[in-house]
């Protein structure tokens, strides 16, 4: 594939006769160092280093700006970083391509006014409606200092991380398998929003396509045998809550696939859904040329309830293993794949996974537990990160197995890793932390298996949700916090009050004492929908930067003010109330792909 790249534009004072010549080496070193920083620290979702393209010439005026723009046009450059140690000619040298995301790094030195060019060119970007990110070091450097200060590196990497995410999703597809689940508003896929804000094509595949491929045998039969053997060896069955129940005929007559054949059906379904999303060259060899192409997916979702799950095994295993960083073939890139085809949460899964590199965990935002309610029900008050209360995140049977927190880093900390760092021991630990409970036939008449685990780790995570609001458009919510490892007495009592066959995570947001983060209750009360996503690490700042690139306002977040990084023009919409300025700026500039 032609990867989305960061174009590095070395901009220079165009005066020949001593000025330009004296700056050539320093300017190109800035470009080379920026490219090296990006490629050594950032990876694409497939695990390969992010690629940069350095301009074929320093840019002293419009002719050279056009020459570099032509060079970039053949390289899938989706964002540009202009770098300079000196004064240059603003509108003669700036990136005027409306289709690239832009940043400018002006060197903070006294010998040459790189900061003056930075200010001048940012004014030009604002005046021309081409917002750019500003990068300017906090401390003055010597002219011969080639190091990149930490604060500058942080901004370069934050910009590049967001730009690569935007480029990665562009021209790919959200694949809806099925339609709307139980009237859930997030399941109403808004093709216009996907196209205009993300550059994503909306595609729909009826669930009957899975049955067609199972019936005819349109899947890799060798891989099916391998996957089924792996499942039987590694996916231990857990609690069956149907035992001892006297189920009515409306339920018993509805299960078409015999219980002892569930795994066979589910494994075939999983292979087929993966093939629908991504294609499979093996199908081409089998003569199924159209099916081999796939749908060019970057994210997807499965309806399930109720037209499928009322008579066929559910997709809980499929959804869980797709979103995990491994399967029967070993480590793999996680697929953002939404339960109940909640398109909005699928988009949140995609955004979170792209900036964090971790598996996206889909959750029902189920219950807020105050310390007082917890003590009343369990006899104990929570402490530690859960001392102010916690939110029960529990999906109806599926979330990425990485969310168990079973992976351990070199220091013994429980973590979620990018797939390229997953070891056999990590995979085994996640599988051992998970059992697969038979679905509750009263809710899932067709049966299936739920991925059941308890996150027994205190990990930094970020919860997010993408919503669409009439009159505003798309918005993003962000809550950084931690997972909590509650005492057994608390966990067991509360878990049994919901559904003990589902995956449970106890989430404790970081509180600020203000607004939606006044207390844990306020976070729950201001959440925009019944679903949310967690990804590993505190990546709220990266999500804010990416959202500003896509022109999506952030409705609530608890990211420290000094970490918030948006295009410089946002300051022209107000500096006292940054949230209001974000709304106005996003409305003014409109979606990225109008």
Q: Where does each model-flagged region fall?
A:
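An N-terminal assembly and electron-transfer interface module characteristic of large anaerobic redox
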Residues: 1-594
């Amino acid at each position: 594939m032609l990867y989305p790249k960061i174009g590095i534009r070395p901009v220079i004072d165009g005066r020949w006769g001593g000025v330009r010549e004296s700056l050539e080496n320093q300017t190109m070193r800035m470009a080379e160092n920026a490219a090296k920083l990006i490629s050594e620290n950032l990876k694409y979702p497939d695990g390969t280093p992010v690629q940069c393209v350095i301009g074929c010439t320093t840019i002293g005026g419009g002719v050279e700006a056009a020459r570099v723009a032509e060079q970039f046009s053949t390289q899938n450059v989706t964002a540009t970083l202009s770098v300079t140690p000196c004064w240059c000619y603003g509108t003669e040298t700036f990136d005027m391509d409306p289709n690239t995301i832009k940043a400018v790094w002006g060197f903070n030195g006294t010998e040459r006014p790189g900061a003056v060019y930075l200010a001048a060119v940012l004014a030009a970007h604002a005046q021309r409606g081409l917002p750019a990110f500003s990068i300017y070091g906090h401390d003055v450097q010597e002219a011969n200092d080639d190091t990149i200060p930490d604060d500058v590196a942080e901004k370069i990497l934050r910009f590049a991380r967001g730009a690569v995410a935007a480029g990665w999703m562009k021209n790919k597809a959200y694949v809806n398998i099925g339609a709307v689940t139980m009237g859930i508003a997030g399941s109403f896929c808004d093709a216009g929003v996907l196209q205009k804000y993300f550059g994503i094509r909306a595609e729909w595949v009826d669930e009957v396509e899975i049955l067609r491929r199972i019936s005819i045998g349109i899947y890799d039969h060798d891989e099916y045998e391998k996957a089924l053997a792996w499942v039987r060896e590694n996916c231990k069955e857990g609690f069956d809550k149907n035992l001892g129940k006297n189920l009515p005929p409306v339920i018993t007559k509805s299960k078409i696939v015999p219980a002892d054949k569930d795994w066979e059906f589910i494994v075939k379904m999983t292979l087929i859904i993966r093939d629908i999303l991504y294609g499979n060259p093996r199908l081409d060899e089998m003569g199924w040329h159209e099916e081999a192409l796939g749908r060019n997916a970057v994210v997807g979702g499965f309806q399930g309830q109720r037209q499928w799950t009322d008579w066929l095994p559910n997709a809980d295993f499929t959804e869980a293993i797709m979103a995990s960083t491994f399967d029967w073939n070993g480590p793999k890139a996680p697929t953002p794949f939404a339960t109940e085809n909640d398109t909005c949460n699928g988009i949140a899964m995609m955004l979170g996974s792209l900036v964090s590199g971790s598996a996206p965990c889909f959750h029902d935002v189920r219950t807020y537990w105050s310390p007082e309610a917890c003590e009343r029900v369990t006899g104990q008050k929570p402490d530690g990160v859960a001392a102010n209360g916690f939110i029960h995140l529990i999906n109806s049977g599926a979330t990425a197995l990485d969310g168990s927190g079973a992976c351990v880093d070199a220091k013994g900390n429980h973590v979620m890793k990018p797939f390229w760092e997953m070891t056999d021991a990590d995979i085994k630990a996640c599988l051992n932390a998970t059992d697969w409970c038979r679905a509750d036939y009263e809710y899932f008449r067709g049966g299936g298996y739920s991925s059941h685990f308890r996150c027994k780790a205190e990990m930094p995570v970020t919860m997010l949700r993408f919503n669409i609001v009439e009159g505003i458009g798309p918005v993003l919510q962000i809550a950084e916090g931690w997972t909590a490892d509650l005492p057994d007495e608390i966990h067991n009592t509360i878990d049994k009050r919901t559904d003990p066959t589902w995956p449970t995570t106890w989430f404790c947001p970081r509180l600020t004492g203000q607004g939606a983060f006044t207390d844990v209750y306020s976070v729950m009360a201001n959440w925009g929908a019944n679903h949310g996503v967690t990804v590993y690490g505190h990546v709220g700042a990266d999500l804010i930067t990416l959202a500003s690139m896509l022109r999506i306002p952030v409705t609530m977040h608890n990211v420290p003010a000094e970490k918030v990084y948006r295009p410089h023009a946002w300051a022209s919409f107000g500096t006292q109330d940054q949230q209001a300025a974000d709304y106005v700026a996003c409305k003014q500039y409109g979606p990225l792909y109008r």
